[in-house]
Design a protein with these regions (language model features):
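Structural and coupling elements of P-loop NTPases
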Residues: 1-606
């Protein structure tokens, strides 16, 4: 039997709304940290990439206590590419805290995560965050949230949601904007008042559905989920109901529950608690761990299908192996299959005729995070332009569309509208306030690949663009790609400032002086539409007639530095991104100039 009440809570929101910051404050004020302990921001985001990017990529659990009740808190990703993580978490919690920015209001991903929680019958708590902003409009945002609840078909009970106003960064919450603001006690108390503790079903036959996976080099594959019924014990034999309908025996080797930020090993755990265990080698998302004498599988969790794919190819550039030690097909295959152990939104298929793999995922960020991890682990590979995955519905070709919300200064709104229209976007609404125009669009995913950098340039960095997967719609036709051409290196060597300076009159460079280049490598962006083969390694000829002041150092503009995502968005169909531990290079698929011309002619007739 359980010795305390248990409540499971997920914190959900759009990216950058303050989820991880709120979890930090809840942990701090619940006494998880010692008085002299140094506390880092976004303490749950313990992955290097999460800290660098300031986003949550993997959902994670922690536990706090308030007035004798154990509260398991799940911090979820806010980015649309990881929405399948959020959906699975909904089956393990009793309520959700929905964070909404007091000035931005509901965003595309707010709608997605809220819809998933309402469909599971949960009654959310609305937390209006960042009420200290100068442009806060908390009451108006509450009305917008109510409209969103209604649009998503919320029941009368769900529409009667409690509202908390607060500043997550300062650890403040209040039930009324006029009340004194001290700490998060109003939120803690509201959780206990609003949510019924999970019933003590510890004496029922065991039922536990897997919501997330992990991997430990010593323990092997780890399964995490809430014990819906029964008691889970170390050493006990259980039945596992698999996705294909089969049932297999397994033995629980290790069992962990959350206490604060750490996982504590236990001999047994009870209904309502979120646990992590080892001993089931091939367990997967949605499968049910059942009592040995009473197999009652729970409804299978659907795993969202990928919408985007890239080809991961063996690096065949002249610089292969310079900085990475993991370069072979076998090594890349092993790494991708290891990733599939825990990254269930990923699909990997071998390519025909060439050494490489077609890797499909939920979006550019989903796949670029994997590439960045591999790069840091010492892998080298080349990657093709992202390609949208089409599907046939009733024998009609369909493609993924995304919900897009743009906020841009009024003076740039016309240009943004024109650009989105060219990309087959469909405008749903437009309104202007305080010098900014808010646009809501439905745009094919194809049309958004490579658009973010153009949007930033158009709005001079003053606009924001948020997107999330919406639905599959009938194919919208050819989208005109108006990207300018590129400068392609002619020979192997080091770039010279003299050559780069002369080339800069025709476009922008993406390499610095003294950069190693090879034939077929992209070194700059042409101001015209055609590609141009150039020699960036050419130096100024020496003469004996030079005056003393004629060799002043040339002044070069800073080169354009592509991040991994920007490089993937930028490349054309006949180009690749070469990814190594110490460099990201752009190159043509066919490096030799004569072979490349022949290849391009052949592609015209394909």
């Amino acid at each position: 039997m359980r010795n305390q009440d248990i409540i499971n809570v997920a914190v959900i929101a759009h990216v950058d709304a303050g989820k991880s910051t709120l979890v930090d404050a809840l942990l701090t004020q619940s006494g998880v940290f010692k008085e002299n302990e140094v506390i880092v921001e976004q303490v749950m985001d313990n992955n290097d990439l999460e800290r660098e990017r300031g986003i949550t990529i993997y959902s994670k659990n922690c536990a706090i206590e308030h007035n004798g009740t154990k509260i398991n808190i799940v911090d979820t990703p806010g980015h649309a590419d990881f929405s399948s993580e959020v959906e699975r978490i909904m089956k393990t919690v009793d309520t959700v805290i929905l964070l909404v920015d007091s000035s931005e209001g509901p965003m595309p991903q707010t709608r997605v995560v809220l819809q998933k929680s309402l469909e599971k019958g949960l009654r959310p708590i609305l937390f209006i965050n960042k009420i200290d902003k100068k442009d806060e409009r908390a009451e108006e945002v509450v009305d917008l949230c109510f409209d969103l609840f209604a649009d998503l078909g919320a029941t009368d009970e769900q529409l009667d949601f409690p509202i908390v106003y607060g500043i997550a960064k300062e650890g403040i919450a209040t039930l009324d904007m006029e009340d004194e603001r001290k700490d998060l006690t109003p939120l803690f108390d509201l959780l206990l008042d609003h949510v019924q503790p999970y019933p003590d079903y510890s004496t029922n036959p065991l039922q536990l559905q897997i919501s997330t996976l992990g991997y430990d080099d010593y323990l092997g594959r780890l399964g995490t989920g809430r014990i819906t019924n029964g008691t889970l014990k170390v050493g006990s034999t259980v039945k596992v109901s698999k996705r294909d309908g089969s049932v297999v025996d397994a033995k629980i080797a290790k069992l962990f529950v959350n206490e604060g930020l750490i996982k504590v090993e236990k001999e047994e755990a009870y209904a309502g608690d979120i646990v992590t265990f080892s001993g089931v080698p091939h367990i997967s998302i949605g499968e049910t761990v059942c009592d040995i004498n009473n197999v009652m599988p729970m409804e299978m969790i659907d795993i969202e299908k990928p919408t985007l794919s890239m080809n991961f190819l063996v690096n065949d550039s002249p610089f292969v192996g310079r900085s990475g030690k993991l370069v072979t097909t076998r090594q890349i295959r092993a790494r991708l299959h290891k990733e599939m152990e825990t990254n269930v939104g990923l699909e990997v298929n071998e390519l025909d005729g060439i050494e490489g793999y077609k890797v499909s995922g939920r979006g550019e960020l989903h796949l670029s995070i994997l590439l960045e991890k591999m790069r840091r682990e010492g892998y080298e590979l080349s990657v093709s332009k992202p390609e949208v995955l089409m599907t046939d519905i009733d024998e009609v070709k369909h493609e993924p569309f995304e919900s897009v919300i743009v906020n841009a200064p009024d003076m740039y709104a016309g240009s943004v509208i024109s650009q989105l229209n060219v990309r087959k976007g469909i405008m749903h609404s437009m309104n202007s306030e305080n010098g900014y125009t808010r646009l809501e669009y439905l745009v094919p995913t194809r049309g958004l690949i490579g658009y973010r950098s153009e949007f930033i340039n158009t709005t001079h960095g003053e606009g924001t663009l948020e997107k999330s997967f919406d639905s599959y719609q009938p194919y919208s036709g050819v989208i005109d790609d108006r990207r300018n051409g590129v400068f392609i290196a002619k020979e192997k060597g080091k770039t010279m400032a003299y050559s780069l300076f002369n080339l800069s009159e025709r476009g922008r460079m993406i390499v610095e002086p003294a950069t190693d280049v090879y034939p077929g490598m992209i070194v700059g962006l042409n101001s015209r539409s055609n590609d141009l083969t150039v020699n960036p390694c050419k130096n100024k000829h020496l003469t004996n007639t030079r005056s003393s002041g004629s060799d002043d150092a040339v002044k070069l503009l800073d080169p354009i530095k592509f991040t991994l995502e920007e490089a993937l968005e930028f490349i054309a169909n006949d180009e690749l991104v070469e990814i190594t531990p110490d460099a990201i290079r752009l190159r043509k698929k066919v490096l030799d100039e004569k072979d490349r011309k022949r290849y391009n002619k052949e592609m015209l007739f394909v």
